């Protein structure tokens, strides 16, 4: 990201050539060195009037040279621990190259920081430089190596950070510059740290710009299969859209924010599906459908969530509604066909279970479990009633003869 207004590739973690979620399956402290004692500031010794014995018997020049040669040299100050192991696992380390000015402070979570970043591979190959990279600290807008190391720096400080690939671009890398599983060296200068924007005082266009930045970060995390961070970024985007405002907005701005909210909710649902958070995904889809009942992506994902929960009878009509809106969509066709087969298998299993419960599976018709379940009890009931009535009549006849 070259500036705060328009984040560039490193800030947004975007993978070149990655789709922007249009499909259904895809979205869709360092110690200072000890200094020697400085005696220049001490007050002068008082004049005692008469020299002491030691003063009266000062050694000559040869003696002074001998004493100087035989005096042990002062022990050097212990070297400071240069590298800070940030997480204690040796995979993310930081060393101060240039300390910050005296009195400078460290940034806080939620502040907007601006850094000068130089990124290199372990062999020294420079792969990226950002003179003015701005991001919100703690919002996961950048790679974790930056988000974890910058809070330990003073404003004005320059530090070297070495990071394992898991805190950078992971197993996917970032083609064509950063190969998969690549550890990186980051030279970071913390230039400024300012409080984040007051959401209530943002104009409509400022809200749109902020929400779009968070959404793009979420898309980049999703492409790297980091669905937890993706969901976090989409949540932040939705918060920027839906938070209270003290600024009047035009109808066009409100409509633009609504469309952006729908996109973020759809992408959030996709991330929640990947994390198997079905109830949360169902809520996200339902919120989309409240605004846009014919939103195909929301219908598709809602049907898929219900299918994952085994609710095939509810999922199939929803997918059919989505297919009716877009009959040529092969993804919906395939999912619907799969669910129809699963429902048929589910019904077959239920029928077999009913037969087993009734204890006479051979006499029960497979196509009409309800009728078969009641046919035998009613026949026995009528037969037993007839026998009982016959017995009563016979008793009456015998009693009359007697």
From Swiss-Prot:
Post-translational modifications reported in the UniProt record:
Ubiquitinated by PRKN during mitophagy, leading to its degradation and enhancement of mitophagy. Deubiquitinated by USP30.
Single Gene Ontology MF annotation:
protein folding chaperone
Q: Which residues form the PPIase FKBP-type domain?
A: 110-194
Provenance organism? Mus musculus
Q: Which positions bear Phosphoserine? A: 286
Q: Which reaction does it catalyse?
A: [protein]-peptidylproline (omega=180) = [protein]-peptidylproline (omega=0)
Q: Per the record, which residues fall in region Disordered?
A: 28-54
Q: What is this protein called?
A: Peptidyl-prolyl cis-trans isomerase FKBP8
């Amino acid at each position: 990201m070259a500036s705060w207004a328009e984040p560039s590739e490193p800030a947004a973690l975007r993978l070149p050539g990655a789709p922007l979620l249009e499909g259904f399956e895809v979205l869709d402290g360092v110690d200072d060195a000890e200094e020697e004692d400085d005696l220049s500031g001490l007050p002068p010794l008082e004049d005692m009037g008469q020299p002491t014995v030691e003063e009266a018997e000062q050694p000559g020049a040869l003696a002074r040279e001998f004493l100087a040669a035989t005096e042990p040299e002062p022990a050097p100050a212990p070297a400071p621990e240069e590298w800070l192991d940030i997480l204690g696992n040796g995979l993310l380390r930081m060393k101060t190259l240039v300390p910050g000015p005296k009195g400078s402070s460290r940034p806080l979570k939620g502040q907007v920081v601006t850094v000068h970043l130089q990124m290199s591979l372990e062999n020294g190959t420079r792969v990226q430089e950002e003179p003015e990279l701005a991001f919100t600290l703690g919002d996961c807008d950048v790679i974790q190596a930056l988000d974890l190391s910058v809070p330990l720096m003073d404003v004005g400080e320059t530090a070297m950070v070495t990071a394992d690939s898991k805190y950078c671009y992971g197993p996917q890398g970032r083609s064509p510059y950063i190969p998969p599983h690549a550890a990186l060296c980051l030279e970071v200068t913390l230039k400024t740290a300012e409080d984040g924007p007051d959401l209530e005082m943002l104009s409509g266009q400022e809200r749109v710009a902020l929400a779009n930045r968070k959404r793009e970060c979420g898309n980049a995390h999703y492409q790297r299969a980091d669905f937890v961070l993706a969901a976090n970024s989409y949540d932040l985007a939705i918060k920027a859209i839906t938070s209270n405002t003290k600024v009047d907005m035009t109808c066009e701005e409100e409509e633009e924010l609504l469309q952006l909210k729908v996109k973020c909710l759809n992408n959030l649902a996709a991330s929640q599906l990947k994390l198997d958070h079905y109830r949360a995904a169902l809520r996200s889809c339902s919120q989309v459908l409240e605004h846009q009942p014919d939103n195909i992506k929301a219908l598709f994902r809602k049907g898929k969530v219900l299918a994952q929960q085994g609710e095939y009878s509810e999922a199939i009509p929803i997918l059919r509604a989505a297919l009716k809106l877009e009959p040529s969509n092969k993804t919906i066709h395939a999912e619907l066909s799969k669910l129809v087969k699963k429902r048929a298998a589910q019904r077959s299993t239920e029928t077999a279970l009913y037969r087993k419960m009734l204890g006479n599976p051979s006499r029960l018709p497979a196509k009409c479990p309800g009728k078969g379940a009641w046919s035998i009890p009613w026949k026995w009931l009528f037969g037993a009633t007839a026998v009982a009535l016959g017995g009563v009549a016979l008793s009456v006849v015998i009693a009359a003869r007697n």
